[in-house]
């Protein structure tokens, strides 16, 4: 029986699941907004928010802990230089999930995963 077992498996091995979420977190930190399925978005929040909390205190030990999870130097740099200082006063809840309909093909529920307080870049209209 699977009582008290938290986390979704997504029909993947443990290594595949870990690599998938590491890549998704790196993309989220780089682009500030990604689109994925709703169950993956909900699970992604469980992995990403503790990393942002870790980045509030910039130390070598915290950078190594973040790198152990992400395995991406660029994402760790963004995490500690941009995101940690941005959320220094926020006690949690750094990520917003926005439902955005269903995927054509398999009708899977989709969602946007967005970093709160992200800078909005105005596009020039010509």
From Swiss-Prot:
GO molecular function terms listed in the Swiss-Prot or TrEMBL record: structural constituent of ribosome
Coiled coil: none
Keywords assigned: Ribonucleoprotein, Ribosomal protein
Record-given protein name: Large ribosomal subunit protein bL17
Family annotation (NCBIfam families): L17
UniProt subunit comment: Part of the 50S ribosomal subunit. Contacts protein L32.
Organism: Xylella fastidiosa (strain Temecula1 / ATCC 700964)
Gene Ontology BP terms: translation
Family: Belongs to the bacterial ribosomal protein bL17 family.
InterPro entries, per database record: Ribosomal_bL17, Ribosomal_bL17_CS, Ribosomal_bL17_sf
Pfam families named among the record's database cross-references: Ribosomal_L17 (PF01196)
Segments passing through the bilayer: none
Gene Ontology CC: one annotated term: cytosolic large ribosomal subunit
Cleavable signal peptide: none
Superkingdom per UniProt: Bacteria
